[in-house]
């Protein structure tokens, strides 16, 4: 016993004794009163009362938004929102709500699934001054409708997904669906009508929300809470619970419970992040969702908390529990892992009246301390009578958190909300009384015996109970049961705890006919139900599932002989609970069997689930096969547990599976064993043939991709879809390639590139290439480094044009991205280009989501990748699918819509029409819009073709395959299947549509067989797969795409040339007619792409009108017969008559079938020759057909054959003595035609290749044959091109497709002659050319510091590189740079040294030393090099910076001879744990572009993460010397013809020649459109020179990157590619300033391709300038790149960078350096010149500023002269 309790009881004992001494005539009740001392103690606990907080919670949220607008406020499964966004969106929506209804006391229901938009809706209602009522769409419609009727809703906010439900439950209200598109449409700045209202201040006394709870009359009761009431509790409560700005708070609670309001408002008011998982993950994978969202704080019931995995608890800062009691064992267990908080609070007094902020602190559980209130305990029968301390009493809550009462229910309000109770007015001896309002909770509690005043929960007083966290009014259940049972039935709902263990269970006790008393004569309290009553119970149960939530449905109906009653004639509930405690779980199931038919569990899965049910629900495993999980005590929580338990037993279930299939038998049918794909990963190279060695696969793949072998990560087969797409794109080059563009602020674009880099590393499909492996076919190769990025400083339209012309084919990247400046603005265009072979419409949003999450620093992992899907396809047994499609397509009629103009016609879509079909919002159908469209189109086709058997193709998502996480796999899975519909005009429309829906579901397991495989199954399948119409049901473009969201920039990508993704899909049309239907909320947009030779534009317009009419008829009259709407008007009928083939009877009704003409009959009866008999037998075996289905007139292609089957046919035929070739098979109209051989040398080469590819003899190929006549296809065309190039013939796939004959193809080929040998630009020593022998490794090796070094390459240095080498070798060594990498925290020194040496090993230029041989400076690449690495301790007391700089000075003065390494590292360590790595490097080895990559590599090497790849500098040298310079010489000759160097030399003599500089920033925010920033300083400098020197032709220098010369992966070249090149401006007298800018920009773009030539090379080879007098530029313009100042260095180490150039480069010229500032709105100009000329420089800088002003908008159109 606690000391306080002992003292209290002694005082109480003394008080009793004292009273007894005074007189013994006191009633016993007198001693139940609280003593004066105890009353004083109670008042001390409750004084002072917290004052009311007079502000609104949304004001706090607004303050947070103003402070941190860019911070993530909501991180939800459906997207993120920043504080700035929720503030903006809620403001706009609030104004709209005011415009719609500004009356007082408005109550607005809110109906959302878990979503980021819920908080926006709630805040908007708060700001508008209205009151919200949160609803959960999972609740029954009857309950939702009862709530809505009470609030008399005129406006209803819902999500788009719940808008239909909202309309049903509130038919009189205005439904406002909330989504991103809602804000875009209504609040767009381009919308004519804008909400024009202001938001009035909201009084704290106004109602904030209404919380509906279970009602005793059967109707939910709504408790009203004002702003101040909520805030008065929320603010102190949040502080105790643990909401902080860094918190990531789980949004778990259902919207039906008020805890969710705290989750939203407390989180946002404290600047934290609300993490909202989807409802599916919330129920099925809570631990996974919390892990992915990095949740730090979660609130839930203890029952749910028990399902969390251990690592989740370990990573939580706090977990708040409420809704039900917390066991001490749970509290102690969880308290060892995280801080456990317990909350209590009835809805009538806000969410939490008490908070125990450390549950594990005591060996028992208290309700915690008061928050915003006072707590009193009274006699349950008399609220004015307080009970003594330690006694059990009803909990009363007083204070500013007590609500206003119940909506429209004054009697109930008066019953439990008490104004000025007597005990409160009276006070105590030490505390004066006060006025106040209390709420009677009905909860029985007592105060903690340790004297701190904390209450301890004991039980409930009334019929309101809590079961597994859900608050239940038993009377509401009884009310709803009684409605459906005979009037003389007695019943009582109760929560019992059956004997034998297990959790509490809701049951109903029933007496079939009213009887009073207790026992039957035999002493048994239990009765029985008649058959008629059992039927009534079954019907009632069905209705309960409609009217009540599942947790309010009794788990069992217990029959009683009589209902136990109290003396007061009330039901004796205590006795009922005693009876309930005497029954077992088996008894409950036995009672239930009385109202359900018993069926034994028999199957293996039923028995397994039966055992799992027993573990979860208690008792023995004797469940019936038709027992209902929820009737047996299950609920949503147990469903979650069952999912996890089943997974542990190797069974796959989901919560929806359980919800939709609650009986044991139906659940067992839905359950399936865990597949191998779900339990194992797919190792690299595990899906290639066993006879293909992994090393050989790597080498072959690397060769075909043109990459290093080490870059190959995996190889596996292509899907049939990928094979077809990559092949067809070779025929139509840009048809299957999409470009998308996002225009973004420059800084955001650069960050987005980094996010893409991260996303690409995590998404193998983006790094995938497709190759053709000789003899094996097509494979996809995943590279470690996809080499996908490029940057251009050009106009975006030009970039798109060039990018479109860069093919995506075999061996090349199928996904790439680039940055393009937006001329005249601070924006950049981010362009992505992607081939359909690596994406589809489903997967691209997943890629963008991955990019957005990377952009925001969130996790990007996904459970599965494309290779898991490939493994699934490989594992499939096609027999089931073959049987399904064979039966499904049996008897298909060949004549389909639209008909072809003639047999063999190749369709080519050339026309496009759009038609919008409006679907009335009042039209409700149980079937999806997709099913209605399928059915309507089948009827349209039938009307036009005149028969009832319709086939068309539909492209599906393909994501119904049983691959775990398939919905999150990035990659193309779309598949096309033939949809066959047979119409019966006498059937009802609803039945017809239901049949189509059922067919769609049935085909799901078979949809990946592939059209090419389906068409081989039979003659009918071939007919069916000759598809004329393709249907794509395209979901509306993600509402977030195309909108500027700085937190999710990947959502802003739009198709480069088309406004919508649906239109983009039309580019992929290979049908006579393709219908892309974009499904929207109120209808669908049909885009029809068609061949006008098959159907005219006018006729197609009428077809779409018929489709529109039929859709409306289906929706309006679903019970009508199909024939009632199968009507064409006269003009439409005339169109149909003209389209129908002659062999379809024109006067037939839809029941008629086509007949074969006499020709086909004769052919089928023709006697077969012996050879034809042999061929038919072989074909039947190869194609899996009956021989009787094969006629002599059939061609192999018509029978469904392909190139592989053709080779099998040739092989088998030759074995039987038939001399057949693949060419004969494909070319002929029958199977016996022959072909002749080709002629001439080129044709002979091609014929030889074709014979190998097509498996035919050369002699069977003639020059007049076309590739496709010979049996070639798109895949074969790519193989032909690849093999031809290997034979020295350069042809393209386009040429293969365009050539009508082999002769034409041969004549178009470019043959590489011996005089034009193919050059391997990667070969070592090749850049030395004819001097390679002179500068041999043996000779050059003599110059090396260590003659034991192994030389792998030698190249001539570039001009600037040579100067840098001299500036390193010779004093003062101005080309040496020292990079200081400063670590503030301790670093692993050994690991750092290893990272530095590995850095050198990875980068060729770092292990390059420089020598001078015969006057030529050479770069000598070593196979390996250990560079100097030293450690130096900074002495105690020394200034670290000064000590390090002294060390650098000493180092730079030491000799750096030719032949030695210029690279060195020195780690300076400090006694405080900090350190500084000094990295020495020469400008001969780097430029400013590549150095940041070096530091990224060093960081990755230290951290052990993926290291960015770089391109060796020698590759750049080879490309420049062998390829670029020869092309550049003519360009520079032409540009500089007749020019001379412009000289700007003041008359001031130079004496000291020291450098000086002057700097100023200029506003360029008004630069003209389509002009790059880089054009401005160049144009301005040209103007200054022209005006200062009175010249119209000026030449000066520019510093360029040297990386735009066409070399692959130029941005990853590691080495000094930079160059000084000449820039010439020959002014025209007619120019405006804008003309000058365009001229400069054009020269920039043109010169970029030739910028690799050095200045001395240009002077020598391209000008008539005197090399002696013109040794350098007089003036140079330089736009400085950005530099990294700090970056993470791995393992939590942060690095800061400082650069030291101990000696400045000698000044040779005027420098005009430009720096982009303020996001491109300003340009900093620095003029560097000699000290003596600095005064002159001030004037020059002023003139530059004036020139820039002339180049801005407003003056750019003025004439220069």
Curated annotation (Swiss-Prot):
One of its GO terms (molecular function) is phosphopantetheine binding. Pathway: Siderophore biosynthesis. The keyword Ligase applies. One of its GO terms (cellular component) is cytoplasm. Residues 1354-1677 are annotated as: Condensation 2. Residues 63-468 are annotated as: Adenylation. InterPro entries: ACP-like_sf, AMP-bd_C_sf, AMP-binding_CS, AMP-dep_synth/lig_dom, ANL_N_sf, CAT-like_dom_sf, Condensatn, PKS_PP-bd. It is an enzyme of class 6 (ligase). Disruption phenotype: Leads to increased sensitivity to oxidative stress and to iron depletion. Reduces the virulence toward maize plantst. Causes a defect in colonization in planta, but not in prepenetration growth or in penetration. Residues 600-675, 1169-1242, 1237-1313 form the Carrier domain. Its EC number is 6.3.2.-. Residues 712-1135 are annotated as: Condensation 1. Induction: Expression is up-regulated under iron depletion. Expression is repressed by the transcription repressor SRE1 under iron replete conditions. SUPFAM superfamilies: Acetyl-CoA synthetase-like, ACP-like, CoA-dependent acyltransferases. Keywords: Ligase, Multifunctional enzyme, Phosphopantetheine, Phosphoprotein. The modification O-(pantetheine 4'-phosphoryl)serine is found at residues 636, 1203, 1274. GO terms for biological process: amino acid activation for nonribosomal peptide biosynthetic process; secondary metabolite biosynthetic process. Belongs to the NRP synthetase family. NRP synthetases are composed of discrete domains (adenylation (A), thiolation (T) or peptidyl carrier protein (PCP) and condensation (C) domains) which when grouped together are referred to as a single module. Each module is responsible for the recognition (via the A domain) and incorporation of a single amino acid into the growing peptide product. Thus, an NRP synthetase is generally composed of one or more modules and can terminate in a thioesterase domain (TE) that releases the newly synthesized peptide from the enzyme. Nonribosomal peptide synthetase; part of the gene cluster that mediates the biosynthesis of hydroxamate-containing siderophores that play a critical role in virulence. Cochliobolus heterostrophus produces extracellular coprogen-type siderophores including coprogen, neocoprogen I and neocoprogen II, as well as the intracellular siderophore ferricrocin. The role of extracellular siderophores is to supply iron to the fungus during plant infection, and the intracellular ferricrocin is required for intracellular iron distribution and storage with a crucial role in ascus and ascospore development. This is Nonribosomal peptide synthetase 6. The lineage of its organism: Eukaryota, Fungi, Dikarya, Ascomycota, Pezizomycotina. The gene is NPS6.
């Amino acid at each position: 016993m606690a000391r306080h309790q002992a003292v209290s009881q002694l005082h109480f004992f003394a008080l009793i004794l004292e009273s007894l001494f005074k007189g013994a005539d006191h009633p016993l009740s007198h001693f139940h009163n609280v003593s004066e001392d105890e009353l004083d103690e109670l008042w001390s606990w409750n004084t002072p009362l917290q004052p009311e907080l007079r502000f609104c919670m949304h004001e706090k949220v607004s303050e947070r938004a103003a402070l941190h607008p860019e911070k993530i406020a909501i991180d939800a499964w459906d997207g993120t929102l920043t504080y700035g966004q929720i503030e903006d969106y809620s403001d706009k929506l609030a104004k709209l709500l005011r415009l719609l209804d500004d009356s007082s006391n408005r109550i607005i229901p809110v109906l959302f699934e878990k979503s980021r938009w819920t908080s926006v809706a709630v805040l908007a209602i708060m700001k508008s001054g209205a009151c919200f009522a949160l609803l959960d769409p999972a609740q029954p419609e009857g309950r939702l409708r009862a709530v809505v009727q009470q609030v008399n809703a005129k406006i209803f906010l819902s999500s788009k997904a719940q808008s239909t439900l909202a309309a049903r439950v509130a038919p009189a209200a205005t439904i406002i669906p909330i989504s991103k598109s809602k804000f875009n449409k209504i609040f767009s700045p381009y919308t004519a009508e804008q909400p024009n209202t202001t938001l009035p201040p909201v009084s704290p006394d106004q109602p904030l929300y209404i919380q509906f709870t279970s009602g005793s009359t059967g109707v939910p009761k709504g408790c009203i809470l004002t702003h101040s009431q909520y805030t008065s509790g929320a603010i102190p409560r949040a502080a105790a619970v643990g909401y902080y700005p860094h918190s990531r708070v789980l949004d778990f609670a259902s919207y039906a419970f008020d805890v969710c309001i705290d989750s939203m408002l407390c989180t946002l008011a404290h600047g934290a992040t609300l993490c909202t998982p989807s409802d599916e993950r919330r129920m099925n994978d809570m631990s996974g969702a919390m892990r992915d969202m990095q949740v730090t704080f979660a609130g839930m019931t203890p029952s749910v908390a028990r399902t969390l995995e251990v690592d989740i608890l370990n990573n939580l800062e706090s977990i708040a529990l409420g809704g039900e009691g917390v066991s001490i064992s749970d509290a102690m267990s969880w308290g060892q892992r995280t801080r456990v908080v317990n909350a209590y609070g009835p809805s009538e007094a806000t969410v939490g009246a008490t908070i125990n902020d450390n549950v594990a602190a005591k060996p028992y559980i208290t309700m915690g301390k008061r928050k915003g209130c006072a707590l009193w305990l009274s006699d349950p029968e008399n609220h004015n009578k307080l009970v003594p301390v330690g006694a059990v009493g009803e909990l009363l809550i007083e204070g500013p958190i007590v609500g206003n009462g119940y909506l429209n229910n004054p009697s109930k309000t008066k019953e439990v909300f008490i104004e000025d109770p007597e005990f409160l007015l009276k006070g105590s001896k030490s505390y004066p009384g006060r006025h106040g309002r209390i709420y009677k909770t009905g909860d029985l509690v007592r105060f903690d015996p340790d004297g701190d005043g904390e209450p301890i929960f004991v039980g409930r007083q009334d019929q309101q109970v809590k079961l597994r966290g859900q608050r239940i009014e038993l009377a509401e259940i009884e009310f709803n049961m009684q409605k459906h049972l005979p009037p003389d039935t007695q019943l009582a709902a109760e929560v019992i705890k059956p004997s034998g263990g297990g959790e509490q269970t809701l049951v109903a006790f029933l007496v079939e006919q009213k009887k009073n008393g207790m026992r039957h004569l035999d002493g048994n309290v239990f009765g029985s139900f008649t058959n008629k009553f059992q039927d009534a119970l079954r019907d009632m149960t069905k209705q309960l599932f409609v009217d009540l939530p599942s947790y309010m449905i009794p788990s069992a109906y217990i029959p009683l002989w009589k209902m136990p009653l109290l003396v007061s004639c009330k039901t004796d509930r205590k006795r009922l609970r005693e009876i309930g405690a005497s029954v077992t779980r088996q008894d409950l199931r036995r009672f239930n069997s009385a109202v359900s038919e018993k069926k034994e569990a028999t199957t293996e899965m039923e028995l397994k689930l039966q055992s799992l049910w027993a573990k979860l629900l208690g008792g023995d495993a004797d469940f019936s096969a038709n027992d209902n999980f929820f009737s047996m005590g299950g609920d949503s929580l147990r469903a979650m547990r069952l999912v996890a338990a089943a997974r542990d037993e190797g069974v796959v279930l989901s919560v929806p599976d359980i919800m939709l299939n609650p009986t044991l038998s139906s659940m067992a049918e839905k359950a399936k064993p865990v597949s191998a794909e779900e339990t194992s990963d797919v190792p690299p190279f595990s899906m290639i043939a066993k006879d293909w060695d992994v090393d050989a696969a790597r080498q072959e793949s690397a060769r075909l991709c043109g990459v290093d072998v080490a870059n190959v990560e995996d190889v596996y087969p292509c899907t049939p879809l990928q094979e077809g797409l990559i092949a067809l794109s070779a025929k139509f080059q840009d048809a299957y390639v999409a470009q998308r563009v996002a225009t973004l602020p420059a800084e955001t674009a650069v960050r987005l590139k980094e996010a893409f880099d991260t996303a690409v590393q995590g998404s193998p499909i983006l790094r995938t290439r497709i190759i053709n492996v000789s003899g094996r076919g097509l494979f996809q190769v995943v590279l470690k480094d996809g080499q996908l990025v490029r940057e251009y400083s050009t106009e975006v339209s030009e970039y798109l044009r060039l990018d479109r012309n860069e093919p995506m084919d075999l061996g090349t990247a199928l996904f790439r991205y680039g940055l393009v400046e937006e001329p005249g603005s601070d924006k950049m265009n981010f362009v992505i280009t992607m081939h359909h072979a690596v994406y589809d419409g489903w997967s691209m949003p997943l890629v963008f989501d991955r990019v957005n999450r990377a952009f925001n620093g969130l996790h990007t992992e996904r459970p599965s990748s494309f290779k898991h899907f490939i493994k699934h396809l490989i594992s499939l047994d096609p027999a089931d699918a073959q049987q399904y499609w064979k039966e499904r397509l049996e008897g298909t009629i060949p004549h389909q819509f639209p008909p072809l103009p003639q047999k063999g016609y190749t369709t080519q879509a050339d026309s496009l029409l759009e038609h919008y079909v409006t679907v009335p919002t009042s039209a409700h159908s149980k079937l999806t819009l997709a099913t209605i469209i399928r059915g309507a189109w089948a009827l349209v086709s039938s009307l036009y073709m005149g028969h009832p058997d319709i086939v068309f193709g539909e492209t599906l998502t393909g994501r119904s395959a049983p691959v775990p996480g398939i919905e999150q796999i990035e990659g193309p899975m779309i598949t096309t299947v033939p949809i066959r519909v047979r119409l019966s005009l006498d059937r009802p429309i609803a039945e017809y549509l239901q049949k189509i829906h059922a067919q769609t579901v049935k085909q799901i397991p078979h949809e990946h067989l592939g059209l090419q495989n389906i068409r081989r199954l039979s003659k009918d399948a071939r007919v069916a797969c000759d598809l004329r119409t393709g249907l794509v049901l395209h979901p509306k473009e993600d509402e977030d795409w195309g909108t500027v969201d700085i937190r999710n920039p990947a959502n802003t990508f739009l198709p480069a040339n088309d406004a919508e993704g649906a239109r983009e899909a039309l580019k992929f049309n290979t049908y006579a007619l393709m219908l892309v239907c974009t499904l929207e909320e109120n209808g669908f947009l049909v885009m029809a792409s068609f061949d006008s030779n098959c159907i005219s534009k006018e006729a197609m317009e009428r077809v779409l009108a018929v489709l529109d009419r039929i859709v409306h008829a289906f929706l309006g009259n679903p019970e009508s017969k199909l024939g009632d709407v199968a009507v064409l008007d006269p003009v439409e009928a005339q169109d149909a008559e003209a389209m129908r083939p002659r062999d379809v009877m024109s006067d037939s009704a839809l029941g008629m079938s086509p007949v074969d003409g006499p020709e086909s009959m004769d052919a089928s009866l023709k006697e077969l020759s012996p050879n034809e008999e042999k061929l038919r037998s072989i074909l039947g075996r190869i194609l899996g057909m009956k021989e009787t289905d094969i006629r002599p007139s059939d061609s192999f292609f018509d029978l469904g054959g392909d190139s592989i089957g053709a080779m099998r046919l040739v092989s088998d035929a030759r074995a039987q003595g038939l001399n057949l070739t693949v060419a004969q098979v494909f070319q002929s109209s029958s199977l016996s035609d022959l072909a002749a051989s080709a002629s001439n040398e080129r044709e002979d080469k091609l014929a030889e290749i074709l014979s190998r590819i097509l498996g035919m003899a050369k002699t069977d190929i003639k020059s007049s044959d076309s590739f496709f006549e010979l049996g070639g296809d798109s895949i074969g065309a790519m193989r032909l091109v690849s093999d031809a190039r290997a034979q020295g013939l350069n042809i393209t796939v386009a040429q293969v497709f365009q050539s009508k004959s082999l002769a034409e193809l041969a004549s178009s080929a470019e043959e590489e002659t011996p005089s034009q040998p193919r050059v391997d630009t990667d070969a070592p020593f090749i850049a030395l050319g004819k001097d390679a022998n002179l500068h041999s490794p043996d000779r050059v090796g003599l110059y090396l510091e260590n003659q034991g070094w192994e030389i792998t390459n030698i190249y001539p240095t570039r001009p600037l590189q040579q100067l840098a080498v001299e500036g390193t070798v010779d004093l003062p060594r101005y080309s040496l740079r020292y990079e200081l990498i400063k670590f503030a925290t301790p670093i692993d020194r050994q690991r750092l040294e290893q990272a530095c040496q590995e850095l050198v090993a990875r980068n060729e230029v770092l292990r390059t030393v420089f020598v001078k041989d015969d006057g030529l400076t050479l770069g000598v690449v070593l196979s390996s090099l250990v560079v100097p690495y030293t450690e130096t301790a900074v002495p105690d007391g020394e200034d670290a910076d000064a000590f390090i700089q002294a060390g650098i000075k000493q180092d730079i003065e030491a000799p750096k001879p030719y032949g030695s390494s210029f690279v060195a590292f020195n780690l300076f360590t400090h006694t405080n744990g900090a350190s500084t790595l000094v990295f020495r490097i020469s400008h001969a080895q780097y430029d400013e572009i590549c150095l940041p990559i070096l530091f990224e590599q060093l960081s990755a090497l230290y951290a052990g993460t993926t290291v960015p790849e770089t391109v060796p500098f020698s590759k750049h040298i080879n490309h420049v010397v062998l390829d670029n310079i020869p092309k550049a010489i003519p360009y520079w000759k032409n540009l500089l013809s007749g020019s001379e160097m412009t000289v700007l030399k003041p008359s001031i003599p130079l004496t000291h020649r020291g450098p000086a500089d002057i700097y100023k920033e200029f506003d360029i925010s008004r630069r003209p459109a389509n002009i790059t920033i880089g054009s401005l300083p160049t144009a301005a400098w040209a103007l200054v020179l022209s005006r200062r020197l009175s010249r119209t032709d000026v030449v000066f220098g520019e510093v360029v990157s040297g990386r735009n010369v066409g070399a692959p992966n130029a941005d990853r070249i590691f080495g000094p590619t930079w160059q000084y090149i000449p820039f010439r401006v020959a002014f025209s007298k007619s120019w405006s300033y804008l003309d000058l800018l365009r001229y400069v920009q054009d020269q920039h773009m043109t010169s970029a391709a030739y910028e690799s030539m050095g200045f001395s090379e240009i002077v020598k080879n391209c000008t008539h300038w005197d090399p002696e007098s013109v040794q350098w530029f007089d003036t140079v313009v330089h736009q400085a790149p950005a530099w990294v100042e700090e970056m993470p260095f791995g393992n939590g180490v942060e690095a800061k960078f400082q650069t030291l150039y101990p000696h400045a480069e000698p000044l040779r010229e005027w420098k005009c350096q430009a720096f982009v500032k303020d996001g491109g709105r300003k340009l900093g100009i620095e003029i560097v010149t000699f000290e003596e000329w600095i005064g002159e420089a001030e004037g020059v800088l002023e003139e530059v500023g004036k020139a820039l002003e002339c180049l801005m908008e407003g003056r750019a159109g003025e004439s220069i002269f």
